[in-house]
A protein has these predicted regions:
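Short, flexible, surface-exposed loop segments at domain boundaries
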Residues: 2-181
């Protein structure tokens, strides 16, 4: 499990965080311990039988690990039943299987944390042309809302180190027999 680009425990991941993962079929002989999926469930989600995760990571980790950033195109006011401010971005970097590979709108609001130079900024710090990283959560009506926006690498690196130290403290408190740092 990775969060903010560093190893994490599931307890470190806030509820609702949009995650990416790699999954396997159960080990031979373990299939009986897992409830079987109905034909209807498998039709809706053909990958549902792959239920053993060997990698889970948040958006900032997933995209930065693969060399992807986002370029801000601007903001616009959304419409519909729950109008919210939208951050218009386009992907910068390689095409990623299982990722967002076209320009997209992310919901932003006053609860979105915007980081620059290791400090919290307000929405006025967002400018077209900036290259950013984001963490997402599920918004209303199947939209993706931003929880965090990092306007520079320094801020994301600081978050990565904070998470790494949190994970090391957890491992030490659980008496892991050895650790190579």
């Amino acid at each position: 499990v990775y969060y903010h680009g560093a190893p994490a425990d599931l307890r470190d991941i806030p509820l609702g965080t949009h995650m990416h993962g790699r999954f396997l079929l159960p080990i031979k002989g373990e299939e009986e311990t897992i409830p079987t999926l109905s034909a209807e469930q498998l039709k809706r989600n053909p990958a549902g039988r792959y239920n053993h995760a060997f990698l889970l990571e948040d958006d900032a980790t997933f995209y930065s690990r693969q060399g992807r950033s986002w370029k801000i195109l601007g903001t616009e006011q959304g419409g519909g039943p729950a109008p919210r401010l939208k951050l218009s971005v386009e992907p910068i970097g390689p095409k990623i299987e299982g990722g967002i590979n076209q320009p997209v709108l992310f919901d932003i609001d006053e609860s979105t944390r915007i980081w620059q130079a290791r400090q919290l900024m307000n929405m006025e710090a967002i400018e077209p042309g900036q290259i950013i990283q984001v963490n997402l959560t599920w918004g209303p009506f199947e939209s993706l809302a931003t929880t965090d926006i990092w306007l520079d690498e320094e801020s994301l690196a600081a978050f990565r180190e904070i998470q790494r130290q949190r994970h090391l403290r957890l491992i030490r408190s659980r008496f892991l027999p050895a650790w190579v740092d």
